[in-house]
Structure formats: C-alpha cells, structure tokens
Amino acid sequence: MKILEIIPQLSSGGGERFVVDLCNELSKEHDVTLMVLHSLDKVDFYLKEVSNNVRVVSMNKRMGLDIGLLFRVYRYIRREKPDVVHTHLRAIMYISFAIMRKNGVMYCHTVHSAADKEAGGSFISSGMRKFCFHRQIGRPSGRERV
C-alpha cells in the first residue's frame, strides 16, 4: 500500500514525534512517503530519526497562507497515486483541492491537540477545515479509515 503522511513541519512537538514513529513503523510493510510542507532547512528536528525506508519530500511552503501549495500538493498526489493520504495538525487545509478531486484516494486526518485549538485560525483556514469535516475527513464515521 502506498501511504502519504503530510505534516506542516518537523519541529520538536508531540504530533511530529508521533508522525515520525508512525512512518517508521508503517514503512516496514508499506511504501511510505512523509511530506513536510515547510522547508527542511528551517526546522528538521526529527529528520535524522526518519527511517531510510521512508521517502521524505519538502514542499517549501511560503510564509502565511500559500495558495500555490494547494495545487502543488494536489499535483503530487495525482502523480504519485497513493492509496492513503493521512494529514496531521494544520496540514489538512492544504489537501482541500485534492479532496474535491478524490480519484480513488482515501483521506484521513488526525487531530493531535484539543480540537478547538486546532480548528482556530483565519476565516479561510477554518473554512477549509469545515469543508473537510463535512466530507468526513478527520472525523469518526463509524468505520475504520486506515
């Protein structure tokens, strides 16, 4: 199975630690790519702990809301054709365009903090998270997602 894990950055947080551990374990039996939205030049706290079996891709997100990143992430998903796209933290807002064009990909999102903290932000980012929520991306649906 091809799995794409997406996280904003590899800073020293608990969500980041979880994603690195998850990628390392999944890579024992699956083809795993870890997409980091921000540049690895700035924050790479956990990069050395990512298994050599995990492909790491940096999308070099610009400061603030990077609209172009929506399309770069979509093109990457379309080109690589993962079976599962799993977002973490605030990365969910950058897969909204890809979700609209599903193409047989299973999307899921993990909330790593209090939901109200993660749901904050600008009108655009909170709107994108609501869009994903209404399409059952990142909320329980009564059946296992991955």
Predicted regions, residues:
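Membrane-interface segments of envelope glycosyltransferases acting on lipid-linked substrates or membrane lipids
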Residues: M1-R143
